[in-house]
Amino acid sequence: MGRMHSPTFDGRHTRFVLTAFFVRQIMALAGFALLATIALGIAALATWNVADPSLSYATGNQPTNLLGYSGAIFADIVMQFLGLSAIIAFLPIIAWAIALIAGRKFNRIPARLVAWVAGAIVCAASLGCFPAPVTWPLPNGIGGVIGDMILRFPALFIGAYPTGTIATILGVIFAAPAAWLMLFAAGIVGGLDDELEREEAVPVATSKARAAREAEEDDEDDGEGFFANMLAFGAIAHYWYITQARLRRLFGLKSKSLHTEFEHPYDFNEYEFGTLNEPSRLKTAINRLDQRSEPSFEERAASRRQMSPPSIALDHDNNADDEPPFDADGRRLPNGILSDDESDDKFTPRQAPGRGQPRITAPSARPKPSERVAREAQASFIAADGFQLPTVHLLAEPKNVVRDNTLSEEVLEQNARLLEGVLEDFGVKGEIIHVRPGPVVTLYELEPAPGIKSSRVIGLADDIARSMSAIAARVAVVPGRNAIGIELPNQTRETVFLRELVGSRDFENSKAKLAMALGKTIGGEPVIADLAKMPHLLVAGTTGSGKSVAINTMILSLIYRMSPEQCRLIMIDPKMLELSIYDGIPHLLSPVVTDPKKAVVALKWTVREMEERYKKMSKIGVRNIDGFNSRVQQALDKGEILTRTVQTGFDRQTGEAMYETEEFDLKPLPYIVVIIDEMADLMMVAGKDIEGAVQRLAQMARAAGIHVIMATQRPSVDVITGTIKANFPTRISFQVTSKIDSRTILGEQGAEQLLGMGDMLYMAGGGRIQRVHGPFVSDNEVEEIVAYLKTQGSPEYLEAITEEEDEDGAGSGPAGAGNFSDSEDPYDQAVAVVLRDGKASTSYVQRRLGIGYNRAASLIERMEQEGIIGPANHAGKREILVPTEADIIER
């Protein structure tokens, strides 16, 4: 009788089965690891950007690659050497990973590796034969450096790199061996297990007899392989459960989740009725779920479902509802778990905003760089014609600022709860529904309880700042929402740089005519405003609040998008410090005006230019500057000449109407932006003239393409008058010293709570106020940009902007003094007054003509220069050197 072998305890084949099982699992894990590595490589290639920092291109920009610096370096190396053939080189590796996962073995592994390398090289040569597209950013071909190197060998025979038909033929010739090598490397050609099966065929045939004899000796070993496999799986499962139990005991974990415990707290059988009468277990689970609960209000309690502790009623009520009640999540519970009657132990579940919809909003990412940044990163050796806009690389790169740990979700959640407690201490009930961290401040949106006035919460700004240990706190109503925004400064403030705004896609793709990068919102989104729609801007703030830096950023924003043919600038800087650095750039219509007297003349010239533009537009029949330029451009493209036929009179002999054809000057009109850095100084010197000119420009200059940016550091009512405020609907307020100044600029308080250094409140035309953090630009950056602009061309100044009109009225002599009063020139009228009345003083001319003191003084000085009156004596009186009207009458 043969010996019996137990499949459970016989280990003859058990070790072999376990070894094969573990080898199979290791191969599968290796396949998955290889597949994950391929996915990372493909992700790095898919997000490859030529402007990312790499071994061949050094820059401080943040890498846009999905894998960061390592992905950018990997993608750059692969694309530089292999080009687009790198994508094809990944295909055999994917086949290897799939084969490993399926448990298939490889034969001739060294040969397949060599075939893979050779196939990648030949594929690069094949792609290098084809011309690169226009958008290809690398200097070599689409086959990379390797493809160009291989193409040098045909160049030795034909004398140059192959192009045209020869290149296409070579590409097709190279494609055939490249495809075969890749298929062989992937195992598609030659098979993976063919030779292994042939090599194992002979040993298998010779062992059939021995296997038959062994089968005859042990007939009961037929199912041994099955039991061995079961033994292997059983051993693995056994050790897995042991390890899992040890981990639970080590870390104090429980087998059932809290959610399962709350859903099915008890098993309803005859042995657990005594346990059901004890509601402590359910209360404990509910309390754990309610650890993060927000304050609830009495008004909301009626609309929420109420849940009572579980109690099992052994005596069922016949009048009970047939349908069992539901819990707070809508699940049907057994009868008796929820009581229909209210009890003392009843509680109301309060849903925290973090459940389902988290109230902590993730900070916004940096603005995505535009195509302009990548385009300017590649140096061009071909000189461009015409005016070239300044490159973004002239601006300072934004620093890599690490997010402050105070902006983590735990800290923000703790601050939200602390703020709720502070408000409750002051008698304000509410809950923080959203927390929006930003680069400078964090916005906490408070949803007040019904009956709480917003003015009451706004008045607690100083108390909130004191209780939260903050420098300042701004409280305002969030437009369009039932929420009050509480803005608290961050401990670590991030600097907003102009480069990340000018180089962003939002700025490049903006459809604004006169786009200006104002800064970032509280959440970190870029703010791009259109000066053409404002149409004028009033900027106010104390010294050191960032007002001058903001003016520089506005000017640079216009310069980075507009050429001198599209936009011209008139700069008025009575302080002679801020805008004088721009003197000499091609965009200027006149040198930077620093004399207040010439500033008045420049504004009056702007008014006359506005009127001339309106005349031109009315003749052509358009309504604004865009329509005028469009009509002119259409005529230039078609080679036409715009004409207009007007009636000039009637023929005396025939009485027929006479017409004349008038031709127009076909020249597009540029936008004109007038920038006044300090309005207070101009108002002190010539307040009446300045206010009148600014009023006319603000009321009428929008359609003519003339816009005014006016800044002042003294936002008082004598500088920002009611007339100016009525014509400047768009305003920006930086930090001010008092609530009165804030109300003067914006019509409400809040600007006194700003942090300075570019922190502003931006009020658009509709009256909506938005907090914006202005970008920073240094003097060195401005100087570099100005130096670059000066190399692009010299400015074409108009002398008439700063020169007063001279109507040759004084040359007619004293004999014509009686006709001076009929002239419209103020100088002629002043001479007529002096010669008629015999009094030559500034105050007398001012009083008689109704003009400003400075204007009258300039007229008196001009009379002295032309010899009509003499210089003032020690008493301030002047002698009239020409005969007066009284002298002429006596003669």
Swiss-Prot record:
<comment type="similarity">
    <text>Belongs to the FtsK/SpoIIIE/SftA family.</text>
</comment>
<dbReference type="GO" id="GO:0007059">
    <property type="term" value="P:chromosome segregation"/>
</dbReference>
<feature type="transmembrane region" description="Helical">
    <location>
        <begin position="114"/>
        <end position="134"/>
    </location>
</feature>
<keyword id="KW-1003">Cell membrane</keyword>
<keyword id="KW-0238">DNA-binding</keyword>
<keyword id="KW-0547">Nucleotide-binding</keyword>
<feature type="transmembrane region" description="Helical">
    <location>
        <begin position="169"/>
        <end position="189"/>
    </location>
</feature>
<keyword id="KW-0067">ATP-binding</keyword>
<dbReference type="InterPro" id="IPR041027">
    <property type="entry name" value="FtsK_alpha"/>
</dbReference>
<dbReference type="GO" id="GO:0016887">
    <property type="term" value="F:ATP hydrolysis activity"/>
</dbReference>
<dbReference type="InterPro" id="IPR025199">
    <property type="entry name" value="FtsK_4TM"/>
</dbReference>
<dbReference type="Pfam" id="PF17854">
    <property type="entry name" value="FtsK_alpha"/>
</dbReference>
<keyword id="KW-0131">Cell cycle</keyword>
<comment type="subunit">
    <text>Homohexamer. Forms a ring that surrounds DNA.</text>
</comment>
<dbReference type="Pfam" id="PF09397">
    <property type="entry name" value="FtsK_gamma"/>
</dbReference>
<dbReference type="InterPro" id="IPR050206">
    <property type="entry name" value="FtsK/SpoIIIE/SftA"/>
</dbReference>
<feature type="transmembrane region" description="Helical">
    <location>
        <begin position="141"/>
        <end position="161"/>
    </location>
</feature>
<feature type="topological domain" description="Cytoplasmic">
    <location>
        <begin position="246"/>
        <end position="891"/>
    </location>
</feature>
<dbReference type="GO" id="GO:0003677">
    <property type="term" value="F:DNA binding"/>
</dbReference>
<dbReference type="InterPro" id="IPR003593">
    <property type="entry name" value="AAA+_ATPase"/>
</dbReference>
<keyword id="KW-0159">Chromosome partition</keyword>
<dbReference type="InterPro" id="IPR002543">
    <property type="entry name" value="FtsK_dom"/>
</dbReference>
<dbReference type="InterPro" id="IPR036388">
    <property type="entry name" value="WH-like_DNA-bd_sf"/>
</dbReference>
<keyword id="KW-0812">Transmembrane</keyword>
<dbReference type="InterPro" id="IPR018541">
    <property type="entry name" value="Ftsk_gamma"/>
</dbReference>
<feature type="compositionally biased region" description="Basic and acidic residues">
    <location>
        <begin position="289"/>
        <end position="302"/>
    </location>
</feature>
<keyword id="KW-0132">Cell division</keyword>
<feature type="binding site">
    <location>
        <begin position="544"/>
        <end position="549"/>
    </location>
    <ligand>
        <name>ATP</name>
    </ligand>
</feature>
<dbReference type="InterPro" id="IPR027417">
    <property type="entry name" value="P-loop_NTPase"/>
</dbReference>
<dbReference type="GO" id="GO:0005524">
    <property type="term" value="F:ATP binding"/>
</dbReference>
<feature type="region of interest" description="Disordered">
    <location>
        <begin position="286"/>
        <end position="373"/>
    </location>
</feature>
<protein>
    <recommendedName>
        <fullName>DNA translocase FtsK</fullName>
    </recommendedName>
</protein>
<comment type="function">
    <text>Essential cell division protein that coordinates cell division and chromosome segregation. The N-terminus is involved in assembly of the cell-division machinery. The C-terminus functions as a DNA motor that moves dsDNA in an ATP-dependent manner towards the dif recombination site, which is located within the replication terminus region. Translocation stops specifically at Xer-dif sites, where FtsK interacts with the Xer recombinase, allowing activation of chromosome unlinking by recombination. FtsK orienting polar sequences (KOPS) guide the direction of DNA translocation.</text>
</comment>
<feature type="transmembrane region" description="Helical">
    <location>
        <begin position="225"/>
        <end position="245"/>
    </location>
</feature>
<dbReference type="InterPro" id="IPR036390">
    <property type="entry name" value="WH_DNA-bd_sf"/>
</dbReference>
<feature type="domain" description="FtsK">
    <location>
        <begin position="524"/>
        <end position="743"/>
    </location>
</feature>
<dbReference type="Pfam" id="PF01580">
    <property type="entry name" value="FtsK_SpoIIIE"/>
</dbReference>
<feature type="transmembrane region" description="Helical">
    <location>
        <begin position="81"/>
        <end position="101"/>
    </location>
</feature>
<keyword id="KW-0997">Cell inner membrane</keyword>
<keyword id="KW-1133">Transmembrane helix</keyword>
<dbReference type="Pfam" id="PF13491">
    <property type="entry name" value="FtsK_4TM"/>
</dbReference>
<keyword id="KW-0472">Membrane</keyword>
